[in-house]
Amino acid sequence: MIPGELLAEPGELELNAGRPTITLVVANTGDRPIQVGSHYHFYETNAGLSFDREAARGFRLDIAAGTAVRFEPGQTRTVQLVALAGDRKVYGFRGLVQGAL
C-alpha cells in the first residue's frame, strides 16, 4: 500500500442511500452565473435563484461531494436535493438558520 492510497471494493456505490430527497425546478433570474456546491444548504443559496425555498430548507444538492451545479443567467433546470444528515444544525452560509432545523 502507498501512503494515502485508497483501495475500493469492486462494484458501484449508491450516494445518499435511504435519505429523503425532493425535486425542485430552479431558475437563475440574475445576469451572472451562480454555482452551488455539493454541501451548501440549498435554502440559503443566492437570492438570484428562484425556487420553493421553504421546501428546500434542510436539503442540499444530491450530487457527489466536492462537485457543484452551475446555473447560467436565465437558465431553468430541475435539481434533486437530499436531506442534510447528522445533527441537522445549520450555521453560516447566509445566516438564515443559525441553529437546528
UniProtKB/Swiss-Prot annotation:
InterPro entries: Urease_beta-like, Urease_betasu_sf, Urease_subunit. The keyword Nucleotidyltransferase does not apply. Its main location: cytoplasm. GO terms for molecular function: urease activity. CDD domains: Urease_beta. GO terms for biological process: urea catabolic process. It is found in: Cytoplasm. One of its GO terms (cellular component) is urease complex. It comes from the Bacteria. Keywords: Cytoplasm, Hydrolase. Heterotrimer of UreA (gamma), UreB (beta) and UreC (alpha) subunits. Three heterotrimers associate to form the active enzyme. Belongs to the urease beta subunit family. This is Urease subunit beta.
